[in-house]
Amino acid sequence: MKQKKLPEFQVEICSPTNDYLIEFVSDKIFTLEGNGASLPYGGTSGEWGYSGSGWTEQHGTPIGADITYYAGYEDTFYRLKVDFPLDKIKDYMERAYAQSGGTTEDKASLEEYKRLGRNERFSANYNSYNSFSNLVFGFAPKGMVVVWLRYGMGVRIELGRYQAEVIKEDKELEKKLFANWSMNRQEVRARDFNPEASPQEWDNYRIRYAYKPVITGENKALRLFEMNYHYYNAELEIMLRPWINNIPIKKRAIPKEISFVWETGKDQQFVGRAYFSWEKTNEAFKKAGNNAKLEFKIAPDNNSFEIFLNDQPLKADSTRVFKTESEYKDSYNNYN
């Protein structure tokens, strides 16, 4: 009997900044199917939530990990041994999230996600959805580890925050790790040690508030097409038609960057962008309370927008608006 091919996924390993890079001694990703999977070769890279690099595809359904690593900036070895919540994993493995509101051959209304299993891959012409594609590990100071599930380029969801344990008896690990290094442990410590290293900033980014984004404008011809959220906790969310017109309230982290696309007529398509300070925006959400409304109010001339939190002005670090040309279903340019 021909063996069933296991679904593929990529693994990413990242750190908050280049000051907090780590190196691995050993690693194993456990799968529901029982086959082995592993981390990419080398140390962490990229930014919080995104490594910026790929590796050999892994196979199966990830359900846990056993990882031993070295944080040079703390001169400490850690072990992360964790089981992921199985019911949650099974649920998310069945989901395929919408990536684009473009003009695919599928004429059905989009949904945030459908239960399509593991083999959906986004295609601008044929398929709006993407199944689980990347398992992302983020390593912060003091053994803080966050794991995300990524679906294509548009959606990234935090699976959980975990705590690695300090390994005190580490001489054998030191021998193994530094055997082929050009520097020894003392030299790495002298170069990288940071007594102020703390996970607090990245723990703070995980704070959530119950709120909903709303896009409004006085132009009766306003059509909304897409809204992309990049949160400080590294999650990504995309809102498309039709639910962009009535985005549900749920617990969300503080936005780092948002962009949204609208039209008010033929050849009148615009994208607005806003960038936020975590400290200032978090203070505003603290005062706003639960079930808040984050409103983006487009000016009648489409050249700017204002931001309100529960009808009170909310200042962004910067905002931008410019014209664009993207194909969407229901566009005034009739791309269907």
What are these regions (language model features)?
Residues E12-P16, V25, Y70, D83-D87, ...:
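A structural detector for beta-sheet-dominated domains
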Residues S26-A71, R223-F276:
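Tryptophan-paired
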Residues L32-G117, Y129, E201-R206, A210, ...:
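Structured domain cores in non-transmembrane regions
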Residues W48-G49, L86-A96, N233-L240, W278-A288:
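Short, surface-exposed linear segments at secondary-structure transitions and domain or protein termini
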